Design a protein with these regions (language model features):
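Enzyme catalytic cores with a strong preference for nitrogen-chemistry domains
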Residues: 1-229
Length: 229
């Protein structure tokens, strides 16, 4: 993801948001002959969050050959639905969820969660794109990956910025393997590598990006704390 995640009140600085948008445009320009999917902050200057500040979304973008694929609710980006609000996570402080947007625009979340049609190796594939917590379905009433599969997704991608904790990777493999098996489609989990500071704590991100077959089998996994293609 372009901006990072646990970065505190940097989310409230307009110059930072503008920089994120600038680099997103550069990534879109660079997507010649390849498909790029990345996380970013999206914002709408004509709308406000519930705190009266600029409307921001924890978002993801898919692009190819200089063009952005469609997103949710008429936007050109995917909107995170499941916003964590516990321990170090503070999404509700900064972001507007897909669930809230659907309520605002009188839409149904399960219908808004549609896969993107992306060309990969000259074949049209319906890709279900999720953002981090959207895949941690245990305590949410809406199962985002299953909903995307029900709506036609042939493969699921989870773009994450998930901080390290002891035993977390084992839990990820169990969770995402089960999701792939339940949905009956392959799943790719892509996690951030590096360090971030929210002004109170420093967090490390261990990567360990992984891919799972439709039967839930772990196919491959990247090394911890290593940038990998």
């Amino acid at each position: 993801c372009i901006p990072g995640y646990l970065i505190g009140d940097l989310w409230e600085q307009q110059t930072f948001l503008d920089d994120c948008q600038y680099y997103a445009e550069k990534l879109v320009e660079a997507s010649q002959d390849i498909c790029i999917m990345f996380g970013n902050v999206a914002f709408e200057k004509d709308k406000l969050n519930e705190d009266g500040r600029l409307r921001k979304y924890n978002a993801a973008v898919a692009c190819q050959n200089g063009k952005v694929f469609g997103g949710y609710m008429g936007r050109n980006f995917i909107i995170k639905n499941s916003l964590p609000n516990y321990r170090e996570f503070d999404d509700y402080r900064y972001f507007y969820s897909l669930q809230k947007l659907c309520a605002e625009e009188d839409a149904v979340v399960a219908e808004a969660l549609q896969p993107l049609e992306i060309t990969i190796r000259d074949k049209q594939i319906k890709v279900g794109l999720m953002i981090c917590e959207d895949g941690w379905t245990e305590n949410y009433h809406l199962n985002v990956p299953q909903t995307l599969a029900n709506n036609g997704a042939e493969i699921l991608f989870n773009l994450s910025c998930s901080p390290y904790s002891l035993g977390k990777n084992k839990k990820r493999n169990k969770l995402f393997g089960a999701q792939a098996k339940e949905a009956g489609v392959p799943l790719v989990y892509c996690n951030n590598v590096g360090i971030q500071n929210n002004g109170k704590n420093v967090f490390t991100y261990d990567g360990c990006s992984s891919a799972y077959n439709a039967d839930g089998t772990l196919i491959t996994s990247a090394e911890m704390y290593a940038d990998t293609l």
